[in-house]
């Protein structure tokens, strides 16, 4: 019966995703469905409600953090910080390195802002605009944008995904980042080589005519983005603060508050906003003034309510599943995979299955954690495994919002996922490394047994 209920839930999630229904509605329906299953199995409604609330309590801090991130992104837009970064880096997109530059610039933006969607809409849009006019197929550019946009989603100190993983595993984002950097170093280098190689093979902007046209498009793109903003090097202060405080491994609330507060001051001093306008932008998001680029609109607490609601509702599942033992069969299968191929393979399998069904990165992370919990006893390693699987695999599923939204923002087709090299290389590389390590461990155990 549990399998049938899970099948109905998966079908509802997939159908709602294809029909464009907000994810929160099938999630709410799933909560009632799972409560009904528990009641049919003889579990009390009050006991299940208590279990659900206890699991919600574990993500209480992250919900507040989501709101702080909304404030940060609004203030970075209002202060001109994002505009300034785009303005000074857009000139890198030229010639055969255009795909590599697109990937690297989106990596930089996503690391600083912690948002894949925001990166795709700002830096991704500009890079796609320049690349398309240079004759680069949007199919390839979309892969570079998608790859770079999720670089920061995985390892940024202000990433909601990283924070969710840390909360679920009982670890700390600042302490997790060094391990994430190490595990992604080789995939990152390989992705850079592939993007550079494709640019060279295509001969992007190789002739003089293309170079002249590309230079003109860069100027137009930068001018459109920067129009109406008073840009000075001071706009970099919020980004420098976030990076510096992250290196000191301070609490994420302190990092976010410092980044948002410094940007709010710049919005008033450099962009001429008043205090009520800043306060309103913190709540509803930044609304560009006449003459400013509409690409900068967004952010604010309101922008985070959707993902916060998804996390809030889906967090109840953990308590319900634990109370009703609904996932015991699936969990046993995942543990069998871990016993045969190692914990990373098990986490990757669970995360991939969740990503295909759930259509939501947040839900993939939470259910992937639920299914593979116990496969890796070390909390730090388990957090790293979730980062190397659930966080990036979600963006490779064409019908997932994690994939569809960034690609739609730059006008790229779903097939661009095949050229999102970084997102494929992170789980593939680490799977290979962990399989070798697991086999060596088994071999050593056999020798010791003799």
Where are these regions (language model features)?
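Hydrophobic transmembrane alpha-helices of multi-pass small-molecule transporters
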Residues: 1-67, 182-200, 206-310, 447-450
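Juxtamembrane membrane-interface segments at transmembrane alpha-helix termini
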Residues: 37-46, 131-138, 155-159, 266-278, ...
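Membrane-embedded alpha-helical segments and adjacent helix-loop junctions characteristic
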Residues: 42-132, 290-370
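Short juxtamembrane and helix-loop transition motifs at transmembrane-helix boundaries
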Residues: 60, 77-88, 104-108, 207-225, ...
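Hydrophobic transmembrane alpha-helices that form the pore/transport pathway of multi-pass ion
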Residues: 95-182, 350-388
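C-terminal transmembrane helix pair
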Residues: 168-188, 319, 338-450
């Amino acid at each position: 019966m549990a399998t049938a209920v899970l099948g109905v839930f998966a079908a509802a999630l997939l159908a709602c995703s294809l029909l464009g229904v907000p994810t929160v509605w099938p999630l709410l329906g799933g909560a009632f469905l799972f409560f009904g299953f528990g009641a049919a199995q003889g579990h009390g409604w009050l006991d299940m409600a208590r279990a659900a609330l206890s699991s919600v309590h574990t993500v209480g801090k992250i919900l507040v953090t989501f709101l702080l991130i909304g404030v940060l992104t609004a203030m970075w837009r209002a202060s001109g910080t994002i505009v300034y970064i785009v303005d000074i880096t857009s000139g890198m997109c030229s010639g055969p390195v255009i795909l590599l530059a697109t990937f690297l610039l989106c990596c930089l933006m996503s690391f600083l802002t912690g948002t894949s969607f925001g990166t795709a809409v700002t830096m991704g849009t500009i890079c796609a605009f320049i690349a398309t006019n240079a004759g680069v197929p949007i199919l390839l550019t979309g892969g570079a944008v998608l790859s770079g946009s999720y670089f920061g989603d995985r390892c940024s100190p202000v990433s909601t995904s990283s924070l969710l993983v840390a909360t679920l595993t009982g670890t700390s984002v600042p302490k997790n980042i060094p391990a994430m950097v190490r595990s992604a170093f080789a995939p990152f280098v390989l992705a850079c080589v592939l993007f550079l190689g494709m640019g060279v093979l295509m001969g992007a902007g190789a002739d003089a005519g293309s170079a002249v046209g590309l230079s003109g498009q860069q100027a137009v793109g930068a001018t459109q983005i920067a129009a109406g903003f008073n840009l000075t090097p001071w706009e970099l202060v919020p980004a420098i603060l976030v990076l510096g405080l992250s290196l000191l491994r301070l609490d994420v609330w302190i990092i976010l508050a410092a980044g948002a507060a410094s940007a709010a001051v710049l919005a008033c001093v450099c962009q001429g906003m008043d205090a009520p306008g800043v306060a309103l932008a913190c709540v509803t998001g930044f609304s560009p003034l006449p003459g400013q680029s509409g690409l900068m609109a967004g952010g604010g607490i309101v922008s985070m309510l959707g993902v916060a609601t998804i996390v809030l509702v889906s967090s109840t599942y953990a308590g319900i599943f634990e109370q009703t033992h609904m996932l015991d069969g699936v969990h046993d299968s995942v543990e069998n995979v871990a016993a045969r191929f190692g914990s990373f393979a098990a986490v990757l399998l669970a995360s991939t299955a969740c990503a295909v069904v759930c259509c939501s990165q947040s839900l993939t992370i939470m259910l992937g954690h639920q299914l593979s919990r116990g496969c890796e006893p070390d909390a730090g390693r388990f957090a790293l495994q979730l980062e190397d699987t659930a966080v990036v695999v979600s963006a490779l599923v064409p019908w997932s919002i994690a994939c569809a939204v960034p690609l739609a923002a730059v006008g790229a087709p779903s097939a661009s996922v095949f050229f999102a090299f970084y997102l494929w290389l992170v789980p593939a590389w680490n799977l290979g490394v962990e399989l070798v390590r697991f086999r060596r461990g088994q071999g050593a155990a056999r020798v010791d047994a003799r």
